[in-house]
Amino acid sequence: RKSHNMNVVQIVSHFDLGGAERIAINIAKSKESDINYHMIEVVRGSSNFSRDYMKELETAGIKYYRSPFTNSKMGIVFFPIRLIALIKKVCPIAIHTHTEIPDLSLYWTCLLAPRIMQDIKIVRTLHNTVLWNKWKSIGRVVEKFMQKHKANISTSNMITCTYQKEFGF
């Protein structure tokens, strides 16, 4: 590792208004003395809230990495290049995803470069009772991947129960 501190990369859809983004920043601001958090967005946030979000990251001393893509599909397709570069730079012990776009983006990265994730723990927070509204078939594949990696943690019992009914485990 490049430092004595452990690095954790959190992936969010975009630096913008959202419950998952709020949870991610709160985790990163938790001030674990031996953990450095890095935040990366899949799709470029461009609202006034995005500017406030990045200012909050800066104030808290959290490193963040912007997406050059405002289109979701382009952001997902090219995300592996960005994540692989970040992994090589910071050598994270864990990668933590928040919601479906980050989940799919990490899965895509692992398909393209499986060995890069070999020693990295995958953590995934379930934030919603309904997942994969528009991409059910893709969701089933990504869910098997997340279950295989024992990555799932939930923000509530209701979310856990709904998830188990929909995807098993």
PLM regions and their residue ranges:
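A short, active-site helix/loop in glycosyltransferases that binds the activated sugar's phosphate group
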Residues: 149-169
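Membrane-proximal helix-turn-helix segments that form the acceptor-binding/catalytic region
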Residues: 81-85, 135-152
